[in-house]
């Protein structure tokens, strides 16, 4: 005979009390007991990308994968996130497995290189062990691993050049991500894995492109960003930067498949002013008539480059436009408790 309802309720309460005693308060909770907290984020440096992500930046306590072709802007996007985390008083770490971090370029993007924790590990195991220890300290706000392709297993480094090491890196990544996921959530650390593209042989239909390191990262990542260079920006005949498109191919904190376009200027990184002009025109705050840009009746300049220079020199106007865009779209630091209740916890 089935137990009565009150017997089941009593058994459940006893089980919950035992779980709480063994694993601590909050180990199990009813989802409706507390109001949902807004998802804390780290801005990316491009307001267009923050909007595409749906919550105003990269989610804290989650894994983010940034991948794309060579020289597409992957590390630039990651370094801007590092700079923004540091600007908010956070501590950042950079695992430079490629041994290719340029401190001068990072400094130009706003990164405090004196405070940045940098490691250049010898093996993939060492890199991921260092990352795991830093995350478990609870003192790191953002950690970047550059790149997954450079996380070479110890057996491969110590072996001969022609030796076969099938699946070693994939197993290494799978084990590391299993360990790190809960630690990231508990510490509120954002882990950015930069990844490279490879081509699968013999693919007849669909895209032959794939990322390195097996499938584990695809599953564990809450956000996956596909970064592509779509155009070269020129000043006369001189190349001054790239037009970059980022597609949010996976997003567990907001609806996916949105995309953003912004300018990356050589030696300067993401053009915040250029991104604000694009979003300002799109949202109706900036008016574009021919090649002229105007804001509330005042001319910003003829051509996007002149308008960008105007905003660079007049930071009060730039900040005002940014505030209006964020308020209209409900992203960033101005998110209210009412807005937060509508933010989905997981997609």
UniProtKB/Swiss-Prot annotation:
Q: Name one GO molecular function term.
A: ATP-dependent DNA damage sensor activity
Q: Which Pfam families match?
A: RecA, RecA_C
Tell me the SMART domains matching this sequence: AAA
Q: Which UniProt keywords apply?
A: ATP-binding, Cytoplasm, DNA damage, DNA recombination, DNA repair, DNA-binding, Nucleotide-binding, SOS response
PROSITE patterns, per database record: RECA_1, RECA_2, RECA_3
Per its UniProt record, what SUPFAM superfamilies does this chain match? Answer: P-loop containing nucleoside triphosphate hydrolases, RecA protein, C-terminal domain
**Primary localisation category:** cytoplasm
> Where is this protein found?
Cytoplasm
Which CDD domains does this one have?
Answer: RecA
Query: Where is ATP bound in this sequence?
Result: 68-75
Leader sequence residues: none
Q: What's the stated role of this polypeptide? A: Can catalyze the hydrolysis of ATP in the presence of single-stranded DNA, the ATP-dependent uptake of single-stranded DNA by duplex DNA, and the ATP-dependent hybridization of homologous single-stranded DNAs. It interacts with LexA causing its activation and leading to its autocatalytic cleavage.
Q: Which NCBIfam families match?
A: tigrfam_recA
Q: Which family does it belong to?
A: Belongs to the RecA family.
Give the protein's recorded name: Protein RecA
Q: Which organism is it from?
A: Nocardia farcinica (strain IFM 10152)
Q: What is the lineage of its organism?
A: Bacteria, Bacillati, Actinomycetota, Actinomycetes, Mycobacteriales
């Amino acid at each position: 005979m089935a137990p009565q309802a009150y017997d089941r309720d009593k058994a459940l309460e006893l089980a919950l009390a035992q779980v709480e005693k063994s694993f601590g308060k909050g180990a199990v909770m009813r989802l409706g007991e507390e109001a949902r907290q807004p998802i804390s984020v780290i801005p990316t440096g491009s307001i267009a990308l923050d909007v595409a992500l749906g919550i105003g930046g990269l989610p804290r306590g989650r894994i983010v994968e940034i991948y794309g072709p060579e020289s597409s802007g992957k590390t630039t996007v990651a370094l801007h996130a590092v700079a923004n985390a540091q600007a908010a008083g956070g501590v950042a770490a950079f695992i430079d497995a490629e041994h290719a971090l340029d401190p001068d370029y990072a400094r130009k993007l706003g990164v405090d290189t004196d405070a940045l924790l940098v490691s250049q590990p010898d093996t993939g195991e060492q890199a991921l062990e260092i990352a795991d220890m830093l995350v478990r300290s609870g003192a790191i706000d953002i950690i970047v691993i550059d790149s997954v392709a450079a996380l070479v297993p110890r057996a491969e480094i110590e072996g001969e050049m022609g030796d076969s090491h099938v699946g070693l890196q994939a197993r290494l990544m799978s084990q590391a991500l299993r360990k790190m996921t809960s630690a990231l959530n508990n510490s509120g650390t954002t882990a950015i894995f930069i990844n490279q593209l490879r081509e699968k042989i013999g693919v007849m239909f669909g895209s032959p492109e794939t990322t390195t390191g097996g499938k584990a990262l695809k599953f564990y990542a809450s956000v996956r960003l596909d970064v592509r260079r779509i155009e070269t920006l020129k000043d006369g005949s001189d190349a001054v930067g790239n037009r970059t498109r980022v597609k949010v191919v996976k997003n567990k904190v907001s609806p996916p498949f949105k995309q953003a376009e912004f300018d990356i200027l050589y030696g300067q990184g993401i053009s915040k002013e250029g991104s604000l002009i694009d979003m300002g025109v799109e949202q109706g705050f900036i008016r574009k008539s021919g090649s002229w840009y105007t804001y509330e009746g005042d001319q910003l300049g003829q051509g996007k480059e002149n308008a960008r220079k105007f905003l660079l020199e007049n930071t009060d106007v730039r900040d005002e436009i940014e505030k209006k865009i964020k308020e209209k779209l409900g992203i960033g630091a101005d998110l209210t408790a009412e807005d937060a209740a509508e933010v989905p916890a997981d997609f």
